[in-house]
């Protein structure tokens, strides 16, 4: 059984091993694979594992030996799952492996803004505190999270984890969600889209990307938000219109934008957000703690093992 990993570096830059997979077959690992290389590298594979390598219908048709695709991520839009099903190829994903890590990054971004961490660390490097006349130095106030309203778009595993953390900070929590109000904890208020935009001091996006959520945050929705609001996106880049967000930051109608995801990844050097000092951007690393990647690695092997035993799990193209 030949197992080919097409972009192994994404989830394993070298600090993990593949011993669980190696028990299941011959494992060939490529750190990265371009579109021009993917057919040649996968042509003899029974099993292909990938993170961001695209597998469209045309590519799948050129891989007659392929029986299984294991996506090393939760999202599965990199594979044409309909075409895979028609060709008898089982496709699986890894749900919920990064919930804690992404929720943690969400609050790392929020606290970086509300506590002005980057600003004051740089001021210390510039010796502003050392030459200050008082025991403490500050030139701009911090913001307490208690009693502020956190609005959440999407209450899946990550959205709910973020809500639980926010509760410990004493925040008021509202959510725009497809879940019924009766199914939510009493401390989460279900609101409309308009209510979410209007009441949130901090608005955090945790919904899937689809036709309904594409550019959920755009020029029109930004006009309905508080000009003191902080917008956080650790979901998917295209949930926001980045040009509209940059414009709102520039004219002061949005206080800050925190994001671990971008519409184009890696982003263009011409992206307007680079010019905005109140844009706090991290390079799609919220999911990538060692612990999350270790869970991912183990679940990838468990998915492959279940497939080989004839009882596939986490199948996304049933």
Q: Where are the model-predicted features located?
A:
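An N-terminal-biased, well-structured beta-alpha scaffold segment characteristic
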Residues: 1-92, 198, 218-220
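Residues that mark the start of a beta-strand
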Residues: 2, 148-149, 172
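Phosphate-binding beta-alpha-beta segment of Rossmann-like dinucleotide-binding domains, i.e.
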Residues: 87, 95-149, 164, 316
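Rossmann-like dinucleotide-binding domain for NAD(H)/NADP(H)
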Residues: 87, 91, 172, 228-318
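N-terminal Rossmann-fold NAD(P) dinucleotide-binding loop
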Residues: 159-160
């Amino acid at each position: 059984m030949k197992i080919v990993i097409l972009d192994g570096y994404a989830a394993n830059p070298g600090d993990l091993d593949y011993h669980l997979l190696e028990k299941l077959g011959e494992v060939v690992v490529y750190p990265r694979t371009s579109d021009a290389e993917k057919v040649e590298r996968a042509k003899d594979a029974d099993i292909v594992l990938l993170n961001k390598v695209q597998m469209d219908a045309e590519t799948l048709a050129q891989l007659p030996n392929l029986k299984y695709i294991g996506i090393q991520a939760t999202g599965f839009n990199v594979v044409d799952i309909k075409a895979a099903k028609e060709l008898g190829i089982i496709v699986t994903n890894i749900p919920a492996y990064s919930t804690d890590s992404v929720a943690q990054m969400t609050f790392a971004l929020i606290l970086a803004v509300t506590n002005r961490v980057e600003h004051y660390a740089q001021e210390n490097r510039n010796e502003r505190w050392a030459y200050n006349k008082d025991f403490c130095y500050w030139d701009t106030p911090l913001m307490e999270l208690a009693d502020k309203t956190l609005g959440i778009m999407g209450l899946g595993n990550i959205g709910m984890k973020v809500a639980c953390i926010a509760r410990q900070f004493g925040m008021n929590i509202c959510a725009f969600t497809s879940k019924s109000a009766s199914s939510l904890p009493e401390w989460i208020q279900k609101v409309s889209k308009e209510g979410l935009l209007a009441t949130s001091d901090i608005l955090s996006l945790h919904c899937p990307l689809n036709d309904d959520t594409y550019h959920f945050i755009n020029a029109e929705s930004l006009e309905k938000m508080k000009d003191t609001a902080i917008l956080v996106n650790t979901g998917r880049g295209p949930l926001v219109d980045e040009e509209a967000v940059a414009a709102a930051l520039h004219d002061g109608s949005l206080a800050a934008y925190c994001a671990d995801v971008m519409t184009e990844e890696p982003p263009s050097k011409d992206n307007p957000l680079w010019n905005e000092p109140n844009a706090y951007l991290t390079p799609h690393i919220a999911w990538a703690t060692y612990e999350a990647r270790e869970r991912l690695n183990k679940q990838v092997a468990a998915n492959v093992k279940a497939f080989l035993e004839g009882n596939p799990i986490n199948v996304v193209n049933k």
